[in-house]
């Protein structure tokens, strides 16, 4: 138990659910997690197929701020991930091949719980990238086309954050991808060793 633990997220990005086993499984996982710790909300599937949850969480890595805003909420419609439930072989948590055509009405967001964008951004930046002679795209990874200058990075980040903040009447919160670089993923706001990667006062101002 620790105060920094805000919620439990048993599953991530389940986009290939079958219509028979997964709904029952996800419902059971929600119940079990809540019984193990009734003091914290359960985000049953982060960024994937939602059955029962205390937090409706979506992932969207659109890099253009205006398009990001439009995708998350437009004309009264919230963003929902596209589920692939008609594959011959579903690819979720270790289930055997099942009939993917069973009738199941997947829930749509109805406002009864918080709606969070708990993955977005992921903008790639390699420290001292502007000083490098080679294109680091081949050596590391991030979402979208990497910015070519630090100023371009700050502009894109601020645009994305402002796009979500402008939806404060619909979106309850956000989580940026990600806090630190991880192995080949060079999209953190800190380096892998937790050293500063940017002007952190400027980063703080953007996220504030």
Language-model segments: residues:
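Short aromatic-enriched loop/helix-cap "lid" or pocket-rim segments at secondary-structure transitions
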Residues: 20-22, 54-56, 68-71, 128-130, ...
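Flexible loop/turn segments at secondary-structure boundaries
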Residues: 14-18, 50-52, 64-65, 123-127, ...
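Active-site neighborhood of glycoside hydrolase catalytic domains
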Residues: 1-56, 62, 112
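Substrate-binding clefts and catalytic carboxylate motifs of secreted carbohydrate-active enzymes
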Residues: 6-8, 31, 76-208
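Short, structured secondary-structure boundary patches
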Residues: 1, 63-67, 197
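Short, hinge-like loop/turn segments at secondary-structure boundaries
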Residues: 58-63, 74-75, 192-193
């Amino acid at each position: 138990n620790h105060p920094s633990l805000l919620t439990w997220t048993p599953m991530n990005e389940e986009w290939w659910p079958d219509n028979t086993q997964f709904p029952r499984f996800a419902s059971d996982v929600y119940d079990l997690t809540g019984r193990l710790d009734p003091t914290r909300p359960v985000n049953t599937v982060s960024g994937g197929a939602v059955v029962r949850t205390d937090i409706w969480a979506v992932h969207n890595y659109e890099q253009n701020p205006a398009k990001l805003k439009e995708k998350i909420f437009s004309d009264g419609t919230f963003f929902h991930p596209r589920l692939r439930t008609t594959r011959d072989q579903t690819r979720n948590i270790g289930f055997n091949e099942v009939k993917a055509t069973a009738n199941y009405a997947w829930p749509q967001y109805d406002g009864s719980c918080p709606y969070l964008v708990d993955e977005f951004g992921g903008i790639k930046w390699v420290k001292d990238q502007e000083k490098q002679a080679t294109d680091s795209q081949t050596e590391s990874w991030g979402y979208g086309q990497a910015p070519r200058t630090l100023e371009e990075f700050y502009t894109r980040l601020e645009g994305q954050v402002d796009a979500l903040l402008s939806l404060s009447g619909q979106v309850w919160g956000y989580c940026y991808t990600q806090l630190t670089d991880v192995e080949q993923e060079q999209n953190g706001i800190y380096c892998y060793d937790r050293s500063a990667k940017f002007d952190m006062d400027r980063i703080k101002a953007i996220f504030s």
